[in-house]
């Protein structure tokens, strides 16, 4: 069985990978399919207690794990810190809202069927998941204010991708909490998480 800190690092790495894609979409208007695929998998596949199976292991989340190490050891972007704090705050609020969790679950089930018909990164799937985020988590507040190129942010397709990646980050934060993560973990066990992330990266193919 994987070390619990490695489980936490894997989930946090997924969150950081999703937030990195939020920034890329907002500033450059593009989505890296290879990085997005494991994150979409976490939204359209049921979680059966195995993060490796859900995400595809450390190799699929290597970019996010590297971002996590940087964030925990030498944070260079206050934007990343703000996004991550916002995601964790919204996930905590969501966890206490049973009605919204039910609505979100129904929406994700519909997305699973759609992804089976098309594929997880199909434009229709991204659009519907983005709409689901807007109808649920965005209503919790406070909203995560994404900065970027105004032209990209006003593009409906790109905006849907941003919301979908935020949803994937919320999903990862939920899994991190299920693995025992919390605010004190980031404060008191920061170095242990860094070591766990390094250990995972050493196994990258």
Swiss-Prot record:
It comes from the Bacteria. It is a peripheral membrane protein. Keywords: Cell inner membrane, Cell membrane, Cytoplasm, Membrane. One of its GO terms (cellular component) is plasma membrane. Coiled coil: none annotated. It is found in: Cytoplasm; Cell inner membrane. Pfam families: DUF489. Belongs to the HflD family. This is High frequency lysogenization protein HflD homolog. It comes from Alkalilimnicola ehrlichii (strain ATCC BAA-1101 / DSM 17681 / MLHE-1).
